[in-house]
């Protein structure tokens, strides 16, 4: 077989296939309904400025149109719904009453109740504790050799355990007695110093020292009372500063 004849046969078969394919497509395009060319009047505003959009629910008997004047849709042969002009477009605005209530609602003000730190923080039924009473309680604990923070005068309740503050300060009761709260000789010198000047003034308040007699551990000096008073004044100031912070 000649190559030219084979080429002609192949070309003839391809042309027939293309013609058959085009013939099959023509009926489909012919059956597709064309949109109406004439502009219909809007049933709502009676305007001719309308256009065809699509077939509703893919049904050829329900063409859907759009009016450019009132910006609303309608379906030919359907029921007209009561749609406002603009295609049911509504702006989301806050009501005037809600806005007014927001404006009239007072904002909570941040005020300080004016309570001192011991009352506001602990408040164990001691509503009248002041800094002066706290200093008095510290002085009372100092003179009676009580551990700090366990005296009932401070508003925390009394405690009979001498180890109540040992875990906090890392010391034992024997060490506290030896140090004597910066007065020396385990408190024995305190009694002798009280006999030398029983009416010493501590923090602006007159105090009556214990008059039970000395223990024989040494002679006390008034300078030790002054130094102890300075030490405890700085301690109280440090506590008050920490409470305010």
Curated annotation (Swiss-Prot):
Positions with a binding annotation for Zn(2+): 42, 45, 67, 70
Swiss-Prot/TrEMBL keywords: DNA-binding, Metal-binding, Nucleus, Transcription, Transcription regulation, Zinc, Zinc-finger
Entry GO CC: nucleus
Tagged with keyword Transcription regulation: yes
GO MF terms, alphabetically ordered: DNA-binding transcription factor activity; transcription cis-regulatory region binding; zinc ion binding
Tissues with expression: The PEAR proteins (e.g. DOF2.4, DOF5.1, DOF3.2, DOF1.1, DOF5.6 and DOF5.3) form a short-range concentration gradient that peaks at protophloem sieve elements (PSE).
Annotated region (Disordered), positions in chain: 15-41, 91-118
Major site of localization recorded for this protein: nucleus
Zinc finger (Dof-type): 40-94
Keyword flag Transmembrane helix: no
UniProt xrefs under InterPro entries: Dof, Znf_Dof
Induction info: By cytokinin in procambium.
Pfam families: Zn_ribbon_Dof
Disruption phenotype: The pear1 pear2 dof6 tmo6 quadruple mutant plants showed a uniform reduction in radial growth, associated with compromised symplastic trafficking.
GO biological process, one term: root radial pattern formation
Compositional bias per record (Polar residues), positions renumbered to this chain: 15-26, 96-108
Subcellular location: Nucleus
Role noted for this protein: Transcription factor that negatively affects seed germination and opposes TCP14 function in the regulation of a specific set of abscisic acid-related genes. The PEAR proteins (e.g. DOF2.4, DOF5.1, DOF3.2, DOF1.1, DOF5.6 and DOF5.3) activate gene expression that promotes radial growth of protophloem sieve elements.
Name assigned to this protein: Dof zinc finger protein DOF3.2
Species name: Arabidopsis thaliana
Top-level taxonomy: Eukaryota, Viridiplantae, Streptophyta, Embryophyta, Tracheophyta
């Amino acid at each position: 077989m000649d190559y030219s004849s084979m080429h002609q046969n192949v070309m003839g078969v391809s042309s027939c296939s293309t013609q058959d394919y085009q013939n099959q497509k023509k009926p489909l395009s012919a059956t597709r309904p064309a949109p109406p060319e004439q502009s219909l009047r809007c049933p709502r505003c009676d305007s001719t400025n309308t256009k065809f959009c699509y077939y509703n629910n893919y049904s050829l008997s329900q063409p859907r149109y759009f009016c450019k004047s009132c910006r609303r849709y309608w379906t030919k042969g359907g029921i007209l719904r009561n749609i406002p002009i603009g295609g049911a477009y509504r702006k989301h605005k806050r009501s005037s009453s809600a806005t007014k209530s927001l404006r009239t609602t007072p904002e909570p003000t941040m005020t300080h109740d004016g309570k001192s730190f011991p009352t506001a923080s602990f408040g164990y039924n001691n509503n009248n504790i002041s800094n002066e009473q706290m200093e008095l309680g510290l002085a009372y604990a100092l003179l009676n050799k009580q551990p700090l923070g366990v005296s009932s005068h401070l508003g925390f309740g009394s405690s009979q355990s001498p180890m109540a503050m040992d875990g906090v300060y890392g010391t034992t009761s024997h060490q506290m007695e030896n140090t004597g709260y910066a007065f020396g000789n385990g408190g024995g010198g305190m009694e002798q110093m009280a006999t030398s000047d029983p009416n010493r003034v501590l923090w602006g308040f007159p105090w009556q020292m214990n008059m039970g007699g000395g223990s024989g551990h040494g002679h006390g000096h008034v300078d030790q009372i002054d130094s102890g008073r300075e030490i405890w004044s700085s301690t109280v100031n440090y506590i008050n500063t920490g409470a305010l912070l």
